[in-house]
From Swiss-Prot:
The gene is fabZ. This is 3-hydroxyacyl-[acyl-carrier-protein] dehydratase FabZ. Its EC number is 4.2.1.59. Involved in unsaturated fatty acids biosynthesis. Catalyzes the dehydration of short chain beta-hydroxyacyl-ACPs and long chain saturated and unsaturated beta-hydroxyacyl-ACPs. It is found in: Cytoplasm. GO terms for biological process: fatty acid biosynthetic process; lipid A biosynthetic process. Pfam families: FabA (PF07977). GO terms for cellular component: cytoplasm; membrane. The keyword Metal-binding does not apply. Keywords: Cytoplasm, Lipid A biosynthesis, Lipid biosynthesis, Lipid metabolism, Lyase. Belongs to the thioester dehydratase family. FabZ subfamily. It is an enzyme of class 4 (lyase). It catalyses: a (3R)-hydroxyacyl-[ACP] = a (2E)-enoyl-[ACP] + H2O.
Length: 148
């Protein structure tokens, strides 16, 4: 398990754009399971939408990307010993994104990503997001680890 303090040592994101609360499972080079608790206090709900708060799909995709970034970094560290101190993960593309159900305040948004392909510093991931085991979004993500 990786808590938010450790996550901040891996990712450069900070409030209000750090979209992972905890990593529950991580199998290096293979998969990651992480989540974010969605609350009405999220800054995004001031405008999306007043009186009918819906967590934006682009934020769900970004949360998937952050979980994928953690997976890529932790996989690159182990067993190669690569230092991630001066590295960053750049999001390269999103393919086949679909939004299936709305995400609302009070939901526990779960991210499950699996590595489809990894070559050098490029990662292709199958990302899915769930609330109460119900699929809310999915996409194929591509990212690259580069020097800062």
């Amino acid at each position: 398990m990786i808590d938010v303090v450790e996550i901040q040592k891996i990712l450069p994101h900070r409030y209000p754009f750090l979209l992972i609360d905890r990593v529950c499972e991580l199998e290096t080079g293979k998969s990651v399971y992480a989540y974010k608790n969605i609350t009405i206090a999220e800054q995004i709900f001031e405008g999306h939408f007043p009186g009918h708060p819906i967590y934006p799909g682009v934020m769900i995709i970004e949360g998937m990307a952050q979980a994928g970034g953690i997976l890529a970094f932790k996989s690159a560290e182990d067993p190669s010993g690569l230092s991630i101190e001066n590295k960053v993960v750049y999001f390269m593309s999103i393919d086949r994104a679909k939004f299936r159900n709305p995400v609302k305040p009070g939901d526990k948004l779960e991210y499950r990503l699996e590595v489809l392909k990894h070559k050098g510093n490029v990662w292709v991931l199958d990302g899915k997001a769930y609330v109460d085991d119900k699929l809310v979004a999915e996409a194929e993500l591509k990212a690259m680890i580069v020097d800062k």
